[in-house]
């Protein structure tokens, strides 16, 4: 795929240039953190590896760069090598470059940029370009009651570009616009013990892949004190995305979304974080399964694997008590440890006429968060649902 090769080469060039120390970067302090990796994921299983992290700090001991390359092993991916470079030029801006390649199927190349104070603080900008092959993806069929016995596997092979803008009309109110282009293909998966999705679910729409070109318009209300590590305030979002065949998409449909978040601090060390979201799709029955709404994974129902339940519409809600239990200087930075007991609820359904609350899946669990103000959050979330325990790791809060 020539386009894929061009993107990979561009990201490699950016990564190489990013590791060349500028005069400013050479003056930064460095802190080295050797970390063993023992990870578990409902879809990928157990992963073991070594993650040597290098922190680049300014004179105020604020992180400016993180170099986090690793080598890991998983029985699905084989040996998986990664290069990750994260940049934090200011409190309002951050960027990242990720290059990952396994010895088997999986690979991931991503370039991301975010600026919350663009054009004299009047515009928020987000951009993401990613090519990924994930051979551990699962599909159980459609519906809120899809059975574990219908589990199938496939490789998600997709290229996606996203640009998101928010123009501030007032300090707390913005108009938003998002444009995305996605090319998705379904290939044979990497889990030999599971049937291929095309064999287990032969009538599933989207097995032949699809091209999606979407234009989203919305309203944003935001009174949070911080977009990275919020402690108080609220967030409200209303969006409508048009995906027309006339713009090059494989079919025509419309997506609607609404989300509310609330953050309540008390007794200095505690923040009660709450979130509720509803998503609806208006369109034909042959909308590809990978474009329909789903619950499961680290951002929604943390006791189930990613995309465990799939259908046209969904409702999710979460609440967690972010509790700072420890704080000290570690590896040259002011680090905080948070414990966050949480509860997640969610349901998918086929029609807007259906109740989004009559058959909710519930998950309870505990999150471990490493917080380095003003921007960096790492998490390990362990959830218990009806199908057992699931664990997720990554960067940034789930909401």
Please place each PLM-identified region on the residue numbering.
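Sec/Tat signal peptide C-region and signal peptidase I cleavage site
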Residues: 22-26
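C-terminal outer-membrane beta-barrel translocator/porin domains of Gram-negative envelope proteins
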Residues: 199-208, 212-337
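Bacterial N-terminal signal peptides
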Residues: 9-19
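Residues that define the transmembrane beta-barrel architecture of outer-membrane proteins
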Residues: 30-32, 44-48, 77-81, 105-109, ...
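Gram-negative/organellar outer-membrane beta-barrel architecture
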Residues: 27-34, 39-211, 377-378, 385-399
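Solvent-exposed, glycine/polar-rich loop segments of beta-barrel outer-membrane systems
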Residues: 192-203, 288-300, 347-365
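C-terminal hydrophobic structural anchor segments
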Residues: 322-361
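Membrane-embedded beta-strand positions of outer-membrane beta-barrel proteins
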Residues: 34-36, 67-71, 97-99, 125-129, ...
């Amino acid at each position: 795929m020539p386009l894929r090769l061009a993107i990979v080469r561009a990201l490699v060039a950016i990564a190489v240039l990013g590791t060349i120390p500028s005069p400013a970067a050479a003056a930064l302090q460095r802190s080295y953190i050797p970390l063993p990796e023992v990870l578990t994921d409902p879809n990928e299983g157990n992963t073991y590896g070594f993650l040597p992290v290098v922190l680049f700090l300014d004179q105020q001991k604020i992180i400016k760069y993180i170099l986090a390359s690793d080598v890991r092993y998983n029985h699905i991916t084989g040996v998986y090598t990664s290069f990750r470079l994260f940049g934090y030029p200011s409190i309002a801006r951050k960027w990242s470059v990720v290059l990952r390649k396994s010895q088997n199927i999986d690979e991931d190349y991503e370039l991301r940029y975010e600026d919350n104070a663009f054009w004299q603080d009047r515009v928020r900008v987000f951009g993401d370009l990613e090519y990924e092959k994930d051979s551990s993806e699962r599909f159980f069929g459609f519906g809120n009651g899809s059975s574990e016995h219908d589990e199938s596997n496939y490789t998600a092979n997709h290229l996606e570009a996203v640009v998101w803008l928010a123009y501030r009309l007032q300090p707390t109110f913005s108009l938003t616009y998002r444009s995305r282009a996605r090319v998705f293909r379904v290939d044979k998966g990497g889990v030999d013990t599971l049937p291929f999705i095309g064999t287990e679910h032969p009538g599933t729409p989207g097995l032949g892949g699809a091209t999606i070109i979407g234009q989203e318009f919305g309203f944003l209300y935001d009174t949070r004190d911080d977009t990275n590590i919020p402690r108080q305030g609220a967030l409200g979002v209303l969006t409508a995305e048009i995906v027309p065949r006339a713009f090059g998409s494989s079919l025509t449909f419309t997506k609607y979304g609404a989300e509310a978040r609330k953050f309540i601090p008390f007794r200095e060390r505690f923040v009660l974080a709450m979130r509720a979201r509803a998503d609806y799709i208006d369109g034909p029955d042959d909308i590809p399964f990978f474009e329909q709404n789903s619950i499961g994974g680290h951002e929604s129902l943390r006791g189930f694997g990613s995309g465990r339940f799939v259908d046209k519409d969904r409702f999710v809600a979460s609440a967690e008590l972010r509790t700072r239990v420890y704080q000290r200087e570690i590896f040259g930075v002011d680090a905080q440890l948070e414990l966050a007991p949480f509860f997640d609820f969610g349901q998918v359904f086929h029609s807007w006429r259906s109740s989004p609350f009559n058959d909710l899946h519930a998950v309870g669990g505990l999150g471990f968060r490493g917080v380095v103000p003003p921007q960096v959050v790492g998490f390990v979330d362990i959830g218990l649902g009806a199908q057992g325990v699931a664990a997720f790791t990554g960067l940034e809060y789930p909401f």
